[in-house]
Amino acid sequence: MNLLSNALSRLAVREPEEGPEKFPVRVKALAERDRRRLLMHFLGLNESDRLLRFGTVLPDELVTRYVQMLNFARDTVFGVYDNRFKLMGVGHLAFAPREALPVVRDATTKERVAEFGVSVSAEARGMGIGTKLFQRAAIHCRNADVDTLYMHCLSSNRTMMHIAKKSGMAIERSYGEADAYLKLDPASPGTVMREAVEEQVAMLDYTLKANTRAATKWLANLTKES
């Protein structure tokens, strides 16, 4: 029993030490089975964070409705899980006809554009999670034949403004709000391979955490019974 316990202890993925460089950020595409944890993530945002993410302080009922209405077949949602299976960051990539977004309508000849929104839990700030989510969204757009990535946020949203400036997005400010968009290069074999590898690594990481967690619970129950 001690041998099994020790093996699981070595296998378990430990919580990161302080410092963003200590934490491997794995961005995983989310699906229907993640909806409950998505709801927990958004309900965990305080009023100021909800204001920055949604442009208004949504009450719990509207946050719940937003999560319930997420369409995984139409849009793409990315997330970063910690070792306790809590979503630390979520990126929502919504696709729309270019006519639906007048601010970028003339910036592309493609039929669709993409709008990106991101939220990061307070305890996970400073780890580069928002940037990683944006980078994954950008490469996904390229591989989906979308060449214009758009963000709308409050000018006071330091996370999104930092991402916009760092990525070289064109930014227009007006009345405390900001519109930013980035022109993307076409897809290449390299971008397709990169996204596939990143998703596979994230899935392996998720599976390892899930199996380790299940085995640890099983061992704990077995110990109680013996």
Where in the sequence are the language-model features?
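Short catalytic-loop micro-motif centered on adjacent basic/acidic residues
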Residues: R53, T148-M151
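Conserved acetyl-CoA-binding loop-helix of GNAT-fold acetyltransferases
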Residues: V120, G126-C141, T148, H162-K166
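Helix-loop element at the rim of GNAT/NAT acetyltransferase active sites that forms part
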Residues: E32, M40-T56
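Terminal substrate-recognition subdomain of acyl/acetyltransferases
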Residues: M1-P24, V118, A122, H152-S226
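Acetyl-CoA-dependent GNAT
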Residues: G55-V113, G117, S121
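A generic structural signal for beta-strand entry/edge sites
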Residues: E111-V113, T148, Y175-D179
